[in-house]
């Protein structure tokens, strides 16, 4: 039924039941039922069928094949070369017709796939552990066979250049005399003798106490001992002085004023009278005389020394002897000094790097922690820690430290244009 | 004529030393690589005598090296390997980002590795010099063998540490060269005498090692890397010397693949079974020197005698270890003394109820004891080695409070307080303790009693008596007084400089003496109360 064209009951109001029964358009449904029954009669209902039953995959090209681009002969040859089947067995080149001058060319060498077929497998390099050998009885110096290079000097030079041969090792000096492994003291035994343990523990306790003391000392140095801190209340009192809110306002006005004046008088400092006393004639005379005597004495001593020097001519032998002795003494002292210096170098920690060496703390167990049997032992300290410290003590490792930050001594200048300056432009009026 | 001045800092300390920064610049290496190179090549920093000179006028604390050392380092081919490695890492990063697994695998196969053989020989030109540096190597490797593997600590490194240390222990066992042990709370110290060199090392206790924070592992790993190479060669040479197969073989000869198996490794690491010896090497028994030297009190003879005592310490004994005992340490010591060790699950699988067990090592209270074997606590084994004889087992029975464990590394000074037990031990080791004993101060009751002379009663009244000689003791008294005075005079003559040292020395002597006396009295008191 075409829209807008209504007949019969359909002409009436759509609100009534009558319209529902007569006026409803049911052609769609009837068509659908008809379709369905027709489909069922002819082959099967399309909706229920699977995709494969209805559709066929189209494998034929729909569009025309794109034309191959025109290639030159050279291009074509190159293309063939890269696309040819390299697995194909290659036979020797065809025999040339006519006169044979050269031998037939061999098969190209780089046919990896053929080689693979033939059974030659290339295995990736594996870093196998080489068996150990006696290094101290084998000659490890690199060599070049004589037929390759027979000039020994040239061989030497070549090996050095390619870093196969090393130059002579610089003389190694002994770095330390300290033992590599320092055995723990008897007191560190897992089941120590009581006196040894006591000794060991008191030493550690003493060290600890010293550390605590030094820390306290620095703390004392840093913190002011009698620092007065103004509290909020005191500040308030000060600000409210003389105001009505002050708790002591007008309480004993007179008393305070009197005390203030008294304090004021006490505080003024009086300088003593400056006097300028002159020496009396007698005193002056005395002083001059003393100076004269001193001068005379000096002169006399000088004279005496000169005379003694003149006598020294006669005791040159003695003087030589004395000088010899002095020299000998000095030599002995210098030798001792050298020895001490060397010993210090070999036994003491050198300053290597910025950091400071911190001595390892000896591990210990408390008396109640000493179980006395191996099963319940409580291990203390770490061996690696010890090793590290030992290496540092033997001057084998530098000790790093943080670099001290430098404070800026000069500040950068910054150019700022003030607003008041900025406002002044060409043509602005100066008031 | 105008004087030509020498330029500053062109000679002396300024040229002989080189700061680390300069060295890095010269070698074109990163700091990390330079550190590794220095450790591997054994080149250490030095503090210049004239620091300001070496530092071109500055007094900053820098790390200095000898210039000749750095020049020598510049020729090292390993530097190129370091550079190759840098390239390798870069490539790896690139490929990983692209997720090209095939290529990554290939790259790993061609990872640049360096060989330390020549460096080992260069640093230790002789075998003896390598042995002298074993302390460090062993201590580090024994510790590393116990660590878990991390990003820095590669698994392969820990495995090889374990392998090499086990091999070394096998050598010590076979050559019976362990001399001293000491159980401290840090770990167990061992001392062996190999080729006349005393090698001391420490092994941590068999517990999980605590975490350490202030240790730079990258540094230690580099040390270990070198020591692994060195220990391999040293072990090989040591094995060769006493006619053992290297790598070690147990029982029948096995081939490469089997040797890599976990089971076989465990067998070797347990130390319980003796190693197979090569047939082509003659075994030499050197008993002759002892007979030649005779029973002298000579130090050498003493040493040889001690060595022989240790070799036959546990001969003919079969030890069973209870499962709570530290197996490695005990097996090591017992087998070093010629004993046989076993436990449940060991390669020789000794059962607890086996008839031929002579000693049963227990570290916990036991309620069921068998009759025909001795029960001891682990400390007995350690103390026996230190004493060089089998100690009586009564004091080491399970459940008994053990006697103190002394360190064999401490040497007693005359005048110190030496406990009674230690004196006994020293005496049993055949050392001359008379001097030490004499120096121990005597308590009042030990001093010879002064007998009171009984004076004959004087008869009362007037009498005649035989004339008496001048008393000799009085003369003696005068003599001592004179001696004392003389000493005092001599003390006065000491220069002021030395006087202080002299007095401080005297007071320390006195203090030590008093301490020793006090301790001795205490010990006596304790003994008396224990007896009562």
Curated annotation (Swiss-Prot), chain B:
Its main location: nucleus. GO terms for molecular function: ribonucleoprotein complex binding; RNA binding. CDD domains: BRCT_pescadillo_like. Gene3D superfamilies: BRCT domain. The keyword rRNA processing applies. It is found in: Nucleus, Nucleolus; Nucleus, Nucleoplasm. The keyword rRNA processing applies. Keywords: Nucleus, Ribosome biogenesis, rRNA processing. InterPro entries: BRCT_dom, BRCT_dom_sf, PES. Residues 309-398 form the BRCT domain. It comes from the Eukaryota. Pfam families: BRCT_2 (PF16589), Pescadillo_N (PF06732). Transmembrane segments: none annotated. GO terms for biological process: lipid storage; maturation of 5.8S rRNA from tricistronic rRNA transcript (SSU-rRNA, 5.8S rRNA, LSU-rRNA); maturation of LSU-rRNA from tricistronic rRNA transcript (SSU-rRNA, 5.8S rRNA, LSU-rRNA). GO terms for cellular component: nucleoplasm; PeBoW complex; preribosome, large subunit precursor. Required for maturation of ribosomal RNAs and formation of the large ribosomal subunit. Belongs to the pescadillo family. HAMAP family: Pescadillo. This is Pescadillo homolog. The lineage of its organism: Eukaryota, Metazoa, Ecdysozoa, Nematoda, Chromadorea. The gene is lpd-7.
